[in-house]
Amino acid sequence: MQTHYYELFFQTDKEYLDLFLDLVFSLDIDAIEEKNDGVYIRSEEDIKLIQIALQSFHQRLCEKFNTKIYFHSTLEKKENKNWIEEYKKGIQALTIDNIHIHTTWQKPKQDKINIIIDPALAFGSGHHESTYTCIEFLQKYTDGSKFCLDVGCGSGILSIIMAKLGAKVQACDTDELAIVASKENAKLNRVSFNDIWVGSVNKSLHKYDIVVANIIADILIILEKDLKEKTKEGGILILSGILNKYEDRIKDKFKDLTLLETKYKGEWLSLAYKKETK
């Protein structure tokens, strides 16, 4: 074991955190830990280049959304303790109704549907408030008769849950590394997808009983027409990754659909809509 390790810490606005995490999880990093005060990245290798990549990504986001986005980071060299084991101790298994999400080093629950996700190797583990409420919706609306699409699949956790519930599942993400992560996690959980591709919802030639999109509000608005188009008449559209302050904005964009339910957790919310038959 080396005598020192490097710890990179960063903070950003909550509505953009998932975009930064997508970048971080796509890199070869030993351990990533998300806490209330921000995100910690630890490695025995110097990670200065990761800090530079995050700073550059921040600048590009500000330009893309034409707004000021808060970002702060620090990089420290620290005395090495067995930080990988300490990191593992800090990761808690999570039970959401009948779904139990755990890591490869934690035990499954015999009476639950078990989902294996290692947070350091994925784009999402279920602990985020928006993912949590999304999973609650999926358990309510998904069954073996459904044809489903996961838009912005990240780690594949939502796709895997739908597959475990018996649905026929397709998934997409604009990040090629997310597709790789989803496929690896599907294999780990012994499920398969009907199709998965690099790109967005508009590449699909199908319509679905359930479309789920757990992505930030700005992207949901950009994809509004495609999300509605790919939802079958009588189908369910689940939107998540929405900060409470954007609730009215999102509801206004999707007001032509029937709002079935709103779930709140912390500063985030998820919405379940039905596309009525004309």
Swiss-Prot record:
InterPro entries: Ribosomal_L11_MeTrfase_PrmA, Ribosomal_PrmA_MeTrfase, SAM-dependent_MTases_sf. It holds the Pfam family PrmA. This is Ribosomal protein L11 methyltransferase. S-adenosyl-L-methionine binds at residues 131, 152, 173, 214. The gene is prmA. Belongs to the methyltransferase superfamily. PrmA family. Methylates ribosomal protein L11. Signal peptide: none annotated. It is found in: Cytoplasm. It comes from Campylobacter lari (strain RM2100 / D67 / ATCC BAA-1060).
